[in-house]
Amino acid sequence: MIDYIKSTVRNRNTIRLLEKNQYTFDVDPKATKTEVKRLIEGVFGVKVIGMNSKRLPIKQKRKGPTAGYAVRYKRMIVTLNSTDSIPVI
């Protein structure tokens, strides 16, 4: 179940969201909000009060004469209780 979370997202927008106690993760496209919520609460010992999710657009990749598509992820924005935090490296 820990395999659902692929990586944390670090860019200008997600750093701004950290001030609001919101953390952004790329997760497996098959993962549901309930599964990710239970995973984050269990692993990090925090209280999740809200979640938003979106599917990232498909990007076409080309290598030589063959073309394909990049792996697609789902992005989750997790809002934590104001007293909780997750250590971000």
Curated annotation (Swiss-Prot):
Per its record, what are the GO molecular function terms?
Answer: rRNA binding; structural constituent of ribosome
Keyword flag Plastid: yes
Concerning PROSITE patterns, the annotation shows: RIBOSOMAL_L23
Query: GO biological process: any one?
Result: translation
Listed under subunit, the entry gives: Part of the 50S ribosomal subunit.
Its function, per the record, reads: Binds to 23S rRNA.
The name under which this protein is listed is Large ribosomal subunit protein uL23c
Origin organism is Zygnema circumcarinatum
The taxonomic lineage of its organism, from the top, reads: Eukaryota, Viridiplantae, Streptophyta, Zygnematophyceae, Zygnematophycidae
The gene it comes from is: rpl23
